[in-house]
Amino acid sequence: MSIKLIETALSEVLLIEPDVFKDHRGFFLETFQKKNYAELGIDKSFVQDNHSHSSRGTLRGMHYQLKYPQAKLIYVITGEIYDAVVDIRRGSPSFGQWKGFSLSAEKKRQLFV
């Protein structure tokens, strides 16, 4: 396993560069593998998997859950997005800070929030 984990300025917000296996047919990658991610310190049980499509120029709002917070693993399958994360968790070392991340289908990076 050579998944690369990149810490960000925000507490518990991580960039992940997964293993990508390329050949003449295209590529293969595991978007999530519980054991491998647990070894990186991401030991979460994902209970929901969503897929969305945004037309060029779309701005989506911020999402959060107070009563039942959810971890999110974000990646892009076509094109590119700019994802802004704002830390509104009281008691977090990075409370009140924000950071923006560019994610693209080409680079295949993931964002764990």
PLM ranges: what are they?
Residues 1-106:
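Non-catalytic, conserved peripheral segments adjacent to functional cores
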